[in-house]
Regions:
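Catalytic-core segments of class I nucleotidyltransferases/pyrophosphorylases
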Residues: 80-164
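Conserved beta-loop-beta/alpha segment of the NTase-like Rossmann-fold superfamily
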Residues: 1-78, 100, 104, 109-117
């Protein structure tokens, strides 16, 4: 239980005691993506495990990714980091590839990385998204997989959005 809500990274850290002696991988999804299908997730989880990655995340692309963290890549298309919209520059806000908040981590790596996260951002929270940049800097095995159907991973944050999804 997350008594104090100090960000998505902090929320995942609340599972540390439960998972400290576990081996394997953990699938982390934000609670506002009810439309994601197991048939979309399972091949990505299988790919993550079979390639022995430390971290895999799902990305998507839409015309207006307002409200979402942006995927930052280098000139060769390699994932560098995720920047939350509140912290984006005007140029970064133009990026259409965004973070729906679906990650697969090796359990042993997720907590090592999360223990390094700081709160030096606009919200003063522990962002799970900061784990991506830290993993990249640590030369961990990471991959961002862009899915074709962004409708599966659109976040539902209002009753109007939920009604639209149900229709």
């Amino acid at each position: 239980t997350q008594v104090e809500q100090l960000g998505t990274g902090h929320a995942v850290l609340q599972t540390k005691e439960l998972l400290k002696n576990k081996k394997g991988h953990i699938l982390i999804l934000y609670g506002d993506v009810p439309n994601i299908k197991a048939s979309t997730l399972m091949p990505i989880v299988d790919d993550h495990i079979s390639n022995n990655r430390d971290l895999t995340l799902i990305t998507a692309e839409i015309d207006d990714p307002s409200g979402y963290g942006r995927i930052i890549r280098d000139k060769n298309g390699n994932l560098l980091k995720i920047i939350e919209e509140k912290d984006c520059s005007d140029n970064e806000k133009k990026i259409k590839e965004w973070n729906p908040g679906i990650y697969i981590f090796k359990i042993k790596e997720v907590f090592r990385i999360l223990n390094s996260i700081k709160t030096n951002n606009a919200s003063k929270e522990y962002y799970l998204t900061d784990a991506i940049g830290l993993a990249q800097q640590s030369n961990m095995q990471i991959k961002a997989i862009k899915i074709a159907n962004s409708g599966e991973v659109i976040g539902i944050n209002t009753t109007d959005q939920l009604k639209e999804l149900e229709d």
